[in-house]
């Protein structure tokens, strides 16, 4: 095992086994409460959604499949008329504020012009239609959310300063926004408007809002908002900051298309990351942070039992959901040794602050820098794991059982995608997930169950 004094990046050519990005529907349809997601694909896409989301059809979830048939692929059917018919049916049954069309691999292959059809159908049915190509051509399944948010970004209203406007113009501009967000959007105190982007549960969003409010920073809005009608206003005077590492496309769209100012901060995962995230936002607004060091120390003290279990243990990230760098940095701060950070895709510009914090954390903890492997080859990873014998492997579901059979403790990386991992108070939930397989093995050892017995053939 080579040890590195600086971060080293490698790139392999491996095929990674991960979910399809259309799985983003699972959490986005719950986050945007007045939305409806229409996935346009084949029966394979439908089977995947039915199995992965685990929602029975009689539950009437706010998503559906538009299954392509031979007539669609051979251009015998009119795509515009078929999609219009489905959207009218959705409008009649659910009447959402927005319909999101999710393109798939098949719509890419047959060159279905969803972007051209959507404006016509939108005009005819009177409901906004957002097109997002969340297909399997992306690197990781979490990038499905990135694609959807980048598409929704174009639908956010334009930010305009209302102070210098005439009365008539002011009323016209204000009417674009919802009653609930109007005052917060236009009357930000002592600092420019701040919009946070990334889909997190409402409780987590409230916690992050509260942490910033302690520093006299008020969040103008979230992308996505809980309701499509409450999207935040965007423009040159608006600052934006991400909460998830896989939203590089959204960040680029916010900067280039909407002219927002991006705050490049580490991500609020773990007490150290949350403190660095808040400090960076404060520094941009010229605000001196108050009580952050004490707040972080208090959280670390509350995590003492978990830290005692993790200290000195080793972990290997195979790469699955683009949360790997942030989680690795947090676990290194907890005293763990990270042998390798496999990651399907690395945007070094968007994650620059996170990579810098990772490097500083390794130096602070006197731990060798982990190697970062982009697009890792799974076969090569297995060979390296056989040599290193880590105490824990954080991996995709496809590799978990084979690794367990070879005596390596595993944790599904997808669990971190759906768990509440952001902010100070949720650090315990992250460590609860990480330590569960280690605690399970400790319990089995006390029972004397140390060997796997092969079944006897009679």
Curated annotation (Swiss-Prot):
Transmembrane segments: none annotated. Binds 1 [4Fe-4S] cluster per heterodimer. The cluster is bound at the heterodimer interface by residues from both subunits. One of its GO terms (biological process) is light-independent chlorophyll biosynthetic process. It is an enzyme of class 1 (oxidoreductase). Signal peptide: none annotated. SUPFAM superfamilies: Helical backbone' metal receptor. One of its GO terms (cellular component) is chloroplast. Its EC number is 1.3.7.7. It catalyses: chlorophyllide a + oxidized 2[4Fe-4S]-[ferredoxin] + 2 ADP + 2 phosphate = protochlorophyllide a + reduced 2[4Fe-4S]-[ferredoxin] + 2 ATP + 2 H2O. The keyword Metal-binding applies. Its cofactor is [4Fe-4S] cluster. One of its GO terms (molecular function) is oxidoreductase activity, acting on iron-sulfur proteins as donors. [4Fe-4S] cluster binds at residues 20, 45, 105. PANTHER family: LIGHT-INDEPENDENT PROTOCHLOROPHYLLIDE REDUCTASE SUBUNIT N (PTHR39429:SF3). Belongs to the BchN/ChlN family. Component of the dark-operative protochlorophyllide reductase (DPOR) that uses Mg-ATP and reduced ferredoxin to reduce ring D of protochlorophyllide (Pchlide) to form chlorophyllide a (Chlide). This reaction is light-independent. The NB-protein (ChlN-ChlB) is the catalytic component of the complex. Protochlorophyllide reductase is composed of three subunits; ChlL, ChlN and ChlB. Forms a heterotetramer of two ChlB and two ChlN subunits. NCBIfam families: DPOR_bchN, PRK02842.1. This is Light-independent protochlorophyllide reductase subunit N. It comes from Angiopteris evecta (Mule's foot fern).
